[in-house]
Amino acid sequence: MSGRITTLCTVLGVAIATVGLYLPYRNELNDYLYQKEFLTGKWSTDAEYVINSGDLGLDISQPIVTVQLIVDKDGSINGEIISETLCDDMPLTWNITMNSDSPSLKNFVFARTFEVRQLINGAMDKSPVVATLKLTEEDQKHNAITFEVVSDATGRLPKKLIFGKDLPKFDENYKFLQDYCAKSTAKFYEEVMPKIKKLRDNPKS
């Protein structure tokens, strides 16, 4: 019994000491964890017109993908991700989010994860997770971030995606993808609606 009490006191002592160290520096620690100013913004993979693309890690072949992120007060991240393959695989709507929960002290050691979801029936939080990405690198010197794709229900995302911030072609890429996704959705409904109508008109066929 005395051994358990000693262990419990030790654990409590460590916890109290940890909290005592955390509280005086919580603002600095939260700034480090949240990376609000750095992560908030427009990110993309197309490094055309960027003369030092190699410094960003963008001198590799990647699909055109755009991401927009907003870091909330609690450090959670709300974002949007869009690409041709994502729109083709999820043609019902191209409202595709990329969100991350508020980080905790464990994220000093473990990378943050982001969940990709699609708006279905007017609900995003209850929709299935399409893909999970892990933020493995933050290069603040060159304004670049790297994600590792942990899971991907579409099977078409590359294993790794590298994004640069505020790249010259972001707006052009974003407009192209918006137009592409609108056409992808229209094509889907053009192909599906006649089949649905046929089933309604001939339920026994």
Q: Where on the chain are the PLM-derived regions?
A:
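Hydrophobic, helix-forming membrane-interacting segments
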Residues: M1-D31
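A short pocket-lining beta-strand/turn micro-motif at the edge of beta-sheets
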Residues: K141-I145
